[in-house]
Amino acid sequence: VRLGLDLLPHCDWIVIHDGARPCLDELILWRGLDAAQHTGAAIPVIPISDTLKQISDQHLVSATVDRNSFWATQTPQVFRREILVRAHQQITHHVTDDSGMLELLGYQVRVFDGETTNLKVTTPPDLKIAEELLRARAI
């Protein structure tokens, strides 16, 4: 992303999308652009449906975590350009996504509804599900 920002022509908004999420619906983009108007940064989230367990170094369950306060993050993430550029200039250590850099700098990141169909393809079963979703959309 950092290198892409240097090459991108001037614009007010940056939308970052993970290429491993091929089933993006256009409505998510519009929701993101709308949500980002409030704080300059917005990310799609979906509720976590699985039970979450905290595991010790000894591979034992040490706690069951209340999943109601946790959400899974997706892309596209939407940012006002100047905020994202500033974050990339000031944060040089690894973070898992661009919104994490803004959080470290004290920016508020607004959330909006993602979609379970906007899945991340990381395993062969994920690929089969994505293929079926895309095939169904083409009908």
Task: Identify the role of each PLM range.
Residues 6, 34, 132-136:
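Short, well-ordered alpha-helices that flank and scaffold nucleotide-derived cofactor binding pockets
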Residues 1-2, 26-29, 124:
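Conserved strand-to-helix beginnings and helix N-cap segments that scaffold or border functional pockets
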Residues 2-13:
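Active-site nucleotide-sugar/metal-binding loop of Leloir-type enzymes
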Residues 20, 92, 116-119:
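Glycine-rich "substrate-gating" loop/helix at the edge of Rossmann-like oxidoreductase active sites
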Residues 4, 17-18, 47, 80, ...:
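Residue-level signal for inorganic ion chemistry
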Residues 118-139:
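Hydrophobic helical membrane-anchoring modules
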Residues 23-112, 139:
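Conserved core of the sugar-phosphate nucleotidyltransferase
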Residues 11-21:
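Short beta-strand-to-loop acidic/aromatic patch adjacent to the donor-nucleotide binding site
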